[in-house]
């Protein structure tokens, strides 16, 4: 297929048009008084959302070059969401502002490479100031505040997340599910999560979230590598008779065995999923034993004189629900005896007390948290399916952002933290590096301005007022007042601000240093010629068909 090439300003201007359109759709969701975006779906009812990344993911433009620009910024929004759980709209607004300012200067003759260097130095300096200004998340109240803001100012969600963290600990596992009714609920169930995802995406049962869920499932645990189907065929036949799903946790599953499992899963013959065993070496054996105790199963190991070919259904663990994504497996409601679990916890605590290695101690504490902490399940209620999906997305975002806050600390929210950090940065740069530095200094005002605009205020006036002051002074867009942001509980996770700025600068630098674009030319399909009508004269005789 023929390709078209566009160069320099022509290419960058089209890329900018794509970024602008994406930005204009996403920016309206920003802040406590951000607006909703209605998205048409290929089937079913349209979805309504105030989540920036959900809007960005839906955008595809007809112009191929503009679409490339939009897709690059869309990727930034997604990466920010994956890493920090929030800040997608901030990253998009920053990327657009940096690209817009940079494009103006490069069109006027600035050197893109020097500009990029100045931008990188400015961003690094601002991030260092953000780190200095951050403070650790203290008690439950601050966790509630962070979660509330990330859930678009929904205090009930904020409280649920804080309660969940209080019950399972800051490092505990928290999952989000749909409730049966319209009320939100919090359940804490015994469970465990480990960092191994499904071995094949064909095991997925929920294509939208790319997760596999098995309810009331058996669990096969082995420290052996499974490469031949005959190793597990007898056991598969026995579990099929029971009519229950099966999760296989093994050192590895490969070749014929994995292919056969996938094919039978796709055909609907087996309800099955497979993951690699967590950990390595001796630690893997211990973690498999932890899972066995939690689920009431037995690790099938040749060291214990057990083989897969002769394994019985009684050796399998059982769990009420198992959820697997590409990175993690969560086992909820394991059917092991509580006394066995308690004994195992005591055993691990004894090992922690006796070990001298910091690394071993850390790994033992991780195992202890997995065994004793359980899993908190937040059940989200709503009156309709559309509302349920929107609310569930908000809870997921709030949960990720809260974990980010616990991890790296918090800064003042409402877009003020970037401005305060920038006020303390004074770099002595020259020529086009200075241009890059000034681009960042102007662009970091954009998030606060957009929050104010969405709330019905003049963005420029609000930014000027905030810049006149120092410390925790900022703008509360919910009521239009200037307040002490920490006292009002208007806070953001440092990780969210940091990653949003880093990603925005990264993609803007790529776009500004782009000198050519290559895309396929859409070929217009020729309209087919009309068929020859010459033989239709005989149709006069059709009168007899009456």
UniProtKB/Swiss-Prot annotation:
Its main location: cytoplasm. PROSITE patterns: CHAPERONINS_CPN60 (PS00296). One of its GO terms (molecular function) is ATP-dependent protein folding chaperone. Gene3D superfamilies: GroEL, GroEL-like equatorial domain, TCP-1-like chaperonin intermediate domain. ATP binds at residues 29-32, 50, 86-90, 414, 492. GO terms for cellular component: cytoplasm. It catalyses: ATP + H2O + a folded polypeptide = ADP + phosphate + an unfolded polypeptide. One of its GO terms (biological process) is protein refolding. Its EC number is 5.6.1.7. It is found in: Cytoplasm. InterPro entries: Chaperonin_Cpn60_CS (IPR018370), Cpn60/GroEL (IPR001844), Cpn60/GroEL/TCP-1 (IPR002423), GroEL-like_apical_dom_sf (IPR027409), GROEL-like_equatorial_sf (IPR027413), TCP-1-like_intermed_sf (IPR027410). It is an enzyme of class 5 (isomerase). Keywords: ATP-binding, Chaperone, Cytoplasm, Isomerase, Nucleotide-binding, Stress response. Belongs to the chaperonin (HSP60) family. Forms a cylinder of 14 subunits composed of two heptameric rings stacked back-to-back. Interacts with the co-chaperonin GroES. NCBIfam families: GroEL, PRK00013.1, PRK12849.1, PRK12850.1, PRK12851.1. Together with its co-chaperonin GroES, plays an essential role in assisting protein folding. The GroEL-GroES system forms a nano-cage that allows encapsulation of the non-native substrate proteins and provides a physical environment optimized to promote and accelerate protein folding. This is Chaperonin GroEL. It comes from Helicobacter pylori (strain P12). The lineage of its organism: Bacteria, Pseudomonadati, Campylobacterota, Epsilonproteobacteria, Campylobacterales.
């Amino acid at each position: 297929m023929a390709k078209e090439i566009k160069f320099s300003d022509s290419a960058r201007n089209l890329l900018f048009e794509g970024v602008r359109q994406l930005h204009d759709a996403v920016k309206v969701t920003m802040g406590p008084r951000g607006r909703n975006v209605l998205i048409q779906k290929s089937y079913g009812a349209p979805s309504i959302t105030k989540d920036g990344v959900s809007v960005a993911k839906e955008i595809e433009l007809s112009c191929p070059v503009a679409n490339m620009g939009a897709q690059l910024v869309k990727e930034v929004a997604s990466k920010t969401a994956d890493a920090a759980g929030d800040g997608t709209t901030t990253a998009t607004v920053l990327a657009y502002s940096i690209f817009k300012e940079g494009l103006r200067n490069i069109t006027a003759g600035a050197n893109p490479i020097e500009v990029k260097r100045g931008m990188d130095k400015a961003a690094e300096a601002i991030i260092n100031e953000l780190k200095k200004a951050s403070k650790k998340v203290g008690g439950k109240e601050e966790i509630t505040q962070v979660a509330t803001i990330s859930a678009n100012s929904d205090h009930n969600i904020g409280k649920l997340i804080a309660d969940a963290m209080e019950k399972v600990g800051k490092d505990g596992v928290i999952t989000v599910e749909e409730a049966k009714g319209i009320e939100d609920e919090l359940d804490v169930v015994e469970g465990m999560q480990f960092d191994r995802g499904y071995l094949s995406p064909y095991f997925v049962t929920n294509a939208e979230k790319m997760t596999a869920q098995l309810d009331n499932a058996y669990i096969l645990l082995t420290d052996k590598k499974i490469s031949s189907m005959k190793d597990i065929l007898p056991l598969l036949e026995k579990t099929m008779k029971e009519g229950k799903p099966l999760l296989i946790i093994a050192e590895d599953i490969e070749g014929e065995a994995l292919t056969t499992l996938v094919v039978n899963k796709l055909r609907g013959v087996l309800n099955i999923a497979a993951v690699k065993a967590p950990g390595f070496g001796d630690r893997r054996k211990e973690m498999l034993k932890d899972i066995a105790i939690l689920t009431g199963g037995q690790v099938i190991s040749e060291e214990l004189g057990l083989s897969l070919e002769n394994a019985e259904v009684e050796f399998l663990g059982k769990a009420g629900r198992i959820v697997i994504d590409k990175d993690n497996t969560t086992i909820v409601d394991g059917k092991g005896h509580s006394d066995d679990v308690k004994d195992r916890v005591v055993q691990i605590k004894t090992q922690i007390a006796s070990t001298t290695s910091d690394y071993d101690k850390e790994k033992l504490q991780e195992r202890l948290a997995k065994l004793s902490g359980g899993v908190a399940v937040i059940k989200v209620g709503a009156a309709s399916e559309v509302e349920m999906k929107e609310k569930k997305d908000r809870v997921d975002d709030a949960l990720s952002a809260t974990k980010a806050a616990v991890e790296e600390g918090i800064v003042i929210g409402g877009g003020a933290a970037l401005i305060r950090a920038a006020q303390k940065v004074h770099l002595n740069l020259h020529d086009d590096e200075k241009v890059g530095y000034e681009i960042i200094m102007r662009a970091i005002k954009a998030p606060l301005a957009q929050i104010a605009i969405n709330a019905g205020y003049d963005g420029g006036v609000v930014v000027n007022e905030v810049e006149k002051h120092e410390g925790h002074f900022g703008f509360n867009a919910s009521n239009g007042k200037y307040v002490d942001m920490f006292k009002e509980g208007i806070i953001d996770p440092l990780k969210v601000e940091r990653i949003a700025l880093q990603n925005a600068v990264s993609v803007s630098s790529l776009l500004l240093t782009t000198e050519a674009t290559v895309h396929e030319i859409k070929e217009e399909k020729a309209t087919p010629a009309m068929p020859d009508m010459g033989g239709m004269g005989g149709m006069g005789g059709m009168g007899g068909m009456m």
